[in-house]
C-alpha cells in the first residue's frame, strides 16, 4: 500500500555565512493513512525541520518527500499551498495568529475559504468542530483576544480539524503550563484522529504528547530511528561530523 506521506533519504542543510548547517541527514520514514506517528527529540534535534518538509513548507536538498505518491518537489508552490490548506493541516502551539476583534467561531470558519462553502455553512461546521474540542456555544462567541493559552490551543486544533485533513502535522502541540490541561488536550487529539480515521505526525520533546501513537520514533543529531513496537523509544547516540554543525 502506498504510504500517505513518505521520506526517502532526505537531507536538509541551511546556509549560515560561510558554513552549512546540517539539519537532517538521509532521513527515511513512512506515514500510512489513519496511522499516528510520534517523533521524540530534544530541541535543535531536527524535528521541526522534519515537520516543515512533511507539510511542504520547505523542500529537501536531496532525497524525496512524497504525499499520496507524488513528490512535493515536483509540485508548484501553488499546489503545495493548496495541499496545506486541504489534505494536510499543520499546527504549532506557538504559531497563534488571529484578528483580535474576531470571534472564535469566525476565526475557525474563515479557515474554510477554499472549501467552497457559504459563510453560513462554514460557521455551522466551525461550531460543530469547536464543540468537539470542548469549546461550547458561549465560548465560540468570545473574541480571540480574550483567550488564554489553553483555549487558544483548542481553537487552533478546531481550525485544523475543520478542513477535514487526511494528515494532521503537529509541532509541540500543547505548551500550556498546566499538566492536566496538556493531558486533556492529548486525549482529545487522539480521539479526534480515531473518529476521523486521520493520520497524525506529532513531534515533541514531551513524551506525554506521544502516548498512544502507533509508531514511535526518536530523532537526534539530524538522524531518525524508528521502531514498530508501540510505546518503545529508541534513542540515537549524539554524533558530530567534522565541518558540519547541527541545528534543529
Segments predicted by a language model, with ranges:
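Conserved ABC ATPase signature
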Residues: 143-149
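Conserved ABC transporter NBD signature motif
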Residues: 63-71
